[in-house]
Structures are given as structure tokens and as C-alpha cells.
């Protein structure tokens, strides 16, 4: 009973102090009253502490000399066991944000409180943080990103808060736009040095949505994004075929960069790494990772420069010949051949006379690199024999596959369970994709038979795993027929009708599956430390 009376007396005393401060014209003359309110935080009364959590922020600005003590008292309140006391203190924090120094400290504390397991408390933290950010974006975001950068235990909670609460209202918060977009870009660049694949995807997705990296941005801006991705791919490290995490990270990062290659970013560093580090040990790479590597390079090959094409063509030709049989065989690795032949066409389109010494062609550009005076007839004979063997094999396998495709619908109709139907449909889909690959191989092999062949350098071929372009509606009006790709000596070909679908697919592919994969053996979080995030499906 005595304790209850003491609590009531303490609460009543605080009410009186609060009323006196509210009515005072010159509050600075009542510093002792404010000190008494601050001291109540150290008392025994829970209700008095809750009331102090309301009164301290209310009069905070009137007593700058007592600001440090008031701030410490508020920090003590959010450490209390009583949930109601903590929530009251959290709600009062935005009222303490009178300058940048206090804002940073409060944002840091609120960032730590994001780890709360109580929904109502976490909701209060979200609202307090957003109120704080709206008051001072720079001073609020900087400590939050510090948690991400330093790898503190609550980093994932902070990232979720940024994703769910901050990023969606960037247009409201980032003003003036150019200055604040640059500020948050610099914060992100420091934070992504050590993140998981899913986290990296989140931050890159956000950066690409900023106006400073928009369609009208200068090419230097696109290159800045490429450099961020290059750093994540660890292109300065020696390639280790046993480091699955690095293989997955390289593949995922290059795919992530594809939309930026399309907009003018340079793929040179990725392609040079592929030539110098990956191709020499390609045979030693695990089979399940080889195809992802080849698909990545294939998708990026249309955006290679002529200089990169000259460097990349020799190893590509060697790999292509390895998987193209010299005579008809039972089957070929159609996925590898499709990728390599697609890469070959797009690179050769950029630098056609490079193929003279590699394949024995007779392409005339008037440059010394034509090497027309040298005899490469054996190369031509070998290459065309391999083309013949590949085509004969593909035609034979395609015929068998076509006959089998007709049986799928019958099998689905006769299937007794949904599980059986699902499996049959899955097999049918795989067969359809395989048929697309075979058709692509035949379409790409045919133009390579001439001494001066036609290299496909436009969007005529849609790789089998990409979204297939829709067929155009029939038209009765006349129109120009599309021109075949040439050796690269004519103006650039018009964009093919499948480009939009392919582009969307590439963007989706770049960002899908980044949270999958096993624990890596590389360095840091997401590279062995947290070890998740860089595997393809």
C-alpha cells in the first residue's frame, strides 16, 4: 500500500512539474523542474517513468544545457523491461532531433531497436525512424547504413527497413534530387562491399531506379554501376575452379550487368576475365556451372566491342570445335554448341576478318589483319567438316525428338494422376526447349559454309532458354523484307522483333535465384561468412 501511495505521489509530482513548465513564459528559469523530470527515470515508479518519457521530449528544446542528460535518460528508458515505457520513449525520440548530432545518435539507437520481437514496439520504431528521416535525411540514413556496412547483428533488420519503408518513398525523401541521390549512392557503394547476393540485388535494383542512372544519364553513370558490379564479382582475384561461390558470383554479377551493357556500360573487364582466367580451366569447372557461364557470355556477346571480340574469338572457336563433332554422332551437347555458336556469330560480326586465320575464311576488309596471303585451307576444311557433322547429328536427333513430341499429348490424356501429368508436361517443356536449341544450331550453322560467310549480328536468333518473341499478326500491306546480317561492314542492323522480350527476360534472369545456393568457400559475408546468395537454380 505504501509503495502504491509513493508511486501515485511521484506521478502527481511530475504532473505538477509538467504543468509549471507548460505555463512558464521563460522556461529557462525552471531548469530545476526539468532536472527533476529527468531524475524520475532513475526512480522506482513505472508510471512515473512513462510520464517522464512524455515530458522529457516535450520540453527538450528549452534546456539545451541539459540536453546530454535528457538524451541519456531517454536511452535508459528504451532499455526498460516494461514494453509501454519503451514504446513511449521511442515515440518521443523524433522530438529530440534538434541538430544533426542528436539525429545521428537517435537513428543509431532506433536502428538497433529494429531487432525488437514485439510487433507493436517494432511498429513504433518504424514510425519514429521515418519521422526522423523526414526531418534530416542525411543524418538519419548515415548511421543506418553504418549498421549494414559494419556487419552488426541487426544489419538484416536495417536492410529490411530500408527496403520496405525508405526506398518506396525515395521521391519524397531525396530532395534536392541530384544531391541526395548522389549521397545515398555513396552510402550504398560502401555498404555493398560485403553483402549477400539477394542484398546486392536489392541495392542495385534501387540504384538503377534513381534518376542519376536513368535512361537520359550520361554513359559515365552506367559505367559507375558496372564498376560496382565488377567489384562484387571480384574480378581482380585469381580464378579458382574449386571456389563454387566465386563462379556463381561471377555468373550472377555478369547477368545482373546485362541491362547496363545494353545501355552502354562496358563489358570489357568481364570478358577479359573470362578469356584469361576462366577459359584456360574451363574443362575443370563443374559441369553444372559450365552452362551458366556460357549462357552469361552468350547473352552479353552482342554488346562486346570489336577489340574484345578479337581477343575472345580464338578461345571461343577452340571451345566450339571441341563440342562440334567431325562426323555424325549419336548426339551433341546442344546447350554448349548453341551458346558457343551464338557467341561466335556476334563476335565475328564485330571483327569478321579475325575468322580468316581461325576458320580459313576469305573475308576482305582491306586491313593487314585479313592475312589473305596465308594458307588456312586446313582450318576451313576442319571447320566445315565439323559443321557438317553437327548439322547431320542435329537433324537426326531432331527427327527422333519430333516423333516423340507427338506422344506427349497422348501421354497427358492417359495419365491417371496429377503428379504423372505434371511430370509429362515438364518433360514436354524440356523437349520443346531442346528443339529450339537444335533449330537455332541449324539456323546458325547454315550461313557459315561459304568462304565469305554471313555472321548473325542482330536479334534474328533468340536463344532457346529466353522468352520467345511473339509472332507478328499477318498484314496485307507490303513491307521491306528484313536484311540478313552481314560481315559487319554495313550500318548496324535494325533491332529484331524479339529484342523486347529477350531484354525483359534478361533483366528477370539477372535478378532471379540470387538467394539460392549453398554455403560458399570464399571471403566475407555471402562469400563464405554468410555464404548464401550467388547460386543459380
Curated annotation (Swiss-Prot):
It holds the Pfam family API5. Disruption phenotype: Male sterility due to lack of tapetal programmed cell death (PCD) and degeneration, leading to defects in formation of male gametophytes. GO terms for cellular component: nucleus. It is found in: Nucleus. Residues 474-492 have a biased composition (Polar residues). Keywords: Apoptosis, Developmental protein, Nucleus. GO terms for molecular function: mRNA binding. Residues 9-363 are annotated as: ARM-like and Heat-like helical repeats. Signal peptide: none annotated. Belongs to the API5 family. This is Apoptosis inhibitor 5-like protein API5. It comes from Oryza sativa subsp. japonica (Rice). The gene is API5.
Amino acid at each position: 500500500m505504501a509503495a502504491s501511495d509513493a508511486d501515485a505521489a511521484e506521478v502527481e509530482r511530475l504532473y505538477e512539474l509538467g504543468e509549471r513548465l507548460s505555463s512558464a513564459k521563460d522556461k529557462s528559469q525552471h531548469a530545476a523542474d526539468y532536472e527533476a523530470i529527468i531524475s524520475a527515470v532513475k526512480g522506482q515508479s513505472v508510471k512515473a517513468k512513462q510520464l517522464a518519457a512524455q515530458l522529457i521530449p516535450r520540453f527538450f528544446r528549452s534546456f539545451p544545457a541539459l540536453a546530454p542528460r535528457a538524451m541519456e535518460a531517454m536511452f535508459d528508458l528504451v532499455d526498460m523491461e516494461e514494453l509501454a515505457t519503451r514504446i513511449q520513449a521511442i515515440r518521443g525520440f523524433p522530438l529530440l532531433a534538434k541538430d544533426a548530432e542528436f539525429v545521428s545518435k537517435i537513428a543509431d539507437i532506433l536502428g538497433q531497436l529494429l531487432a525488437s520481437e514485439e510487433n507493436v514496439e517494432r511498429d513504433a520504431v518504424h514510425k519514429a525512424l521515418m519521422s526522423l528521416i523526414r526531418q534530416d535525411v542525411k543524418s538519419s540514413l548515415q548511421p543506418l547504413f553504418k549498421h549494414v556496412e559494419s556487419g552488426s547483428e541487426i544489419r538484416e533488420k536495417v536492410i529490411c527497413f530500408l527496403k520496405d519503408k525508405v526506398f518506396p518513398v525515395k521521391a519524397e525523401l531525396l530532395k534536392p534530387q541530384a544531391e541526395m541521390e548522389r549521397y545515398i549512392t555513396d552510402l550504398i557503394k560502401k555498404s555493398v562491399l560485403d553483402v549477400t547476393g539477394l542484398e546486392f540485388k536489392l541495392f542495385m535494383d534501387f540504384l538503377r531506379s534513381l534518376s542519376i542512372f536513368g535512361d537520359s544519364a550520361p554513359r559515365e553513370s552506367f559505367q559507375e554501376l558496372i564498376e560496382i558490379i565488377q567489384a562484387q564479382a571480384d574480378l581482380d582475384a585469381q580464378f579458382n575452379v574449386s571456389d563454387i561461390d566465386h563462379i556463381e558470383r561471377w555468373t550472377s554479377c555478369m547477368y545482373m550487368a546485362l541491362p547496363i551493357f545494353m545501355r552502354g556500360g562496358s563489358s570489357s573487364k568481364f570478358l577479359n576475365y573470362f578469356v584469361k582466367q576462366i577459359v584456360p580451366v574451363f574443362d575443370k569447372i563443374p559441369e553444372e556451372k559450365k552452362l551458366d557461364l556460357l549462357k552469361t557470355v552468350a547473352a552479353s556477346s552482342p554488346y562486346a566491342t570489336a577489340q574484345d571480340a578479337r581477343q575472345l574469338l580464338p578461345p571461343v572457336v577452340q571451345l566450339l570445335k571441341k563440342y562440334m563433332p567431325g562426323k555424325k554422332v549419336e548426339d551433341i551437347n546442344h546447350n554448349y554448341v548453341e551458346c558457343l555458336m551464338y557467341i561466335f556469330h556476334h563476335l565475328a560480326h564485330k571483327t569478321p576478318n579475325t575468322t580468316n586465320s581461325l576458320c580459313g575464311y576469305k573475308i576482305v576488309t582491306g586491313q593487314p589483319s585479313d592475312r589473305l596471303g596465308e594458307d588456312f585451307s586446313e582450318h576451313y576444311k576442319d571447320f566445315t567438316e565439323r559443321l557438317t557433322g553437327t548439322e547431320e547429328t542435329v537433324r537426326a536427333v531432331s527427327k527422333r525428338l519430333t516423333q516423340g513430341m507427338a506422344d506427349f499429348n497422348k501421354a497427358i490424356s492417359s495419365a491417371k494422376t496429377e503428379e504423372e501429368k505434371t511430370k509429362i508436361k515438364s518433360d514436354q517443356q524440356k523437349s520443346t526447349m531442346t528443339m529450339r536449341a537444335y533449330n537455332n544450331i541449324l539456323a546458325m550453322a547454315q550461313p557459315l559454309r561459304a568462304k565469305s560467310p554471313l555472321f548473325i549480328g542482330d536479334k534474328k536468333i533468340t536463344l532457346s532458354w529466353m522468352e520467345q518473341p511473339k509472332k507478328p499478326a499477318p498484314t496485307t500491306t507490303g513491307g521491306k523484307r528484313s536484311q540478313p546480317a552481314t560481315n559487319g561492314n554495313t550500318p548496324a542492323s535494325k533491332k529484331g522483333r524479339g529484342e523486347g522480350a529477350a531484354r525483359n527476360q534478361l533483366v528477370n534472369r539477372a535478378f532471379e535465384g540470387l538467394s539460392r545456393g549453398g554455403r560458399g568457400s570464399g571471403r566475407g559475408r555471402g562469400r563464405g561468412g554468410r555464404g548464401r546468395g550467388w547460386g543459380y537454380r
